[in-house]
Design a protein with these regions (language model features):
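An acidic, carboxylate-rich microenvironment
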Residues: 24, 53, 65, 174-177, ...
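Short histidine/acidic/glycine/proline-rich micro-motifs that form metal-
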Residues: 11-16, 43-45
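Charged helix-capping and loop-helix junction motifs
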Residues: 18-25
Length: 192
């Protein structure tokens, strides 16, 4: 059945070659038995918010802008997979999440994040990328260290919310240097 209420903005188009528009919807309210509500587009820094503008900000890693435009934190949801446990061996265990291949991710790098586990939120730091210090593959994953958290969460479904870009992903000469950088990144996150 056709919806009894329809909302759209003035630039809304639909149908073959986007030939349908707000005028068509207004003109056909009685015929199809619905009420049209035309809403103004939301703006961010004096520009219309659109899915295109949001995707552009995501690909630029500008997560604060993304979150303001969305009205909520940008997030990925996934199951925590078993990894090589290298994070645990250096005292910085991580939750490894393989994101859905269709999910748009921010650029490879380290981000201040918040993780939601079983309804509870925790401050975290996440690396988006291929982990070049310890991996040789090209599969993108999200590897998250939950700050001051010790529980095992393998096979749990978690939500990772992105807030701030910290630095680009890079290769380190040793696990010790990687550990030192992660610890510095955690301190950066605590200060933000």
């Amino acid at each position: 059945s056709f919806p009894t209420r329809r909302s759209s903005d003035l630039d809304f188009h639909f149908g073959t070659k986007a030939s349908g528009n707000v005028k068509f919807l207004k003109d056909n309210q009685k015929k199809y038995g619905y009420n049209l509500i035309v809403v103004e587009k939301e703006q961010y820094h004096n520009k219309d918010i659109s899915s295109t503008s949001i995707r552009k900000k995501i690909t630029e890693g500008k997560m604060q802008d993304v979150n303001e435009m969305l009205g909520h934190p940008y997030r990925i949801i996934g199951k925590v997979e078993q990894g090589k446990h290298l994070g645990r061996t250096i005292g910085l265990p991580t939750a490894n999440i393989i994101p859905d291949e269709t999910k748009l991710l921010p650029p490879n790098g380290v981000y201040r994040t918040v993780v939601v586990v079983e309804g509870q939120t925790f401050n975290a730091i996440s690396n988006v990328g291929v982990n070049p210090t310890v991996e040789t593959g090209t599969k993108i994953k999200v590897e998250t260290h939950i700050i001051d958290y010790e529980n095992y969460i393998y096979n749990e479904i978690v939500q990772v919310q992105f807030y701030d870009f910290i630095r680009p992903e890079r290769t380190f000469d040793s696990l010790e240097k990687l550990k030192q950088q992660i610890e510095a990144d955690i301190e950066t996150c605590r200060r933000i």
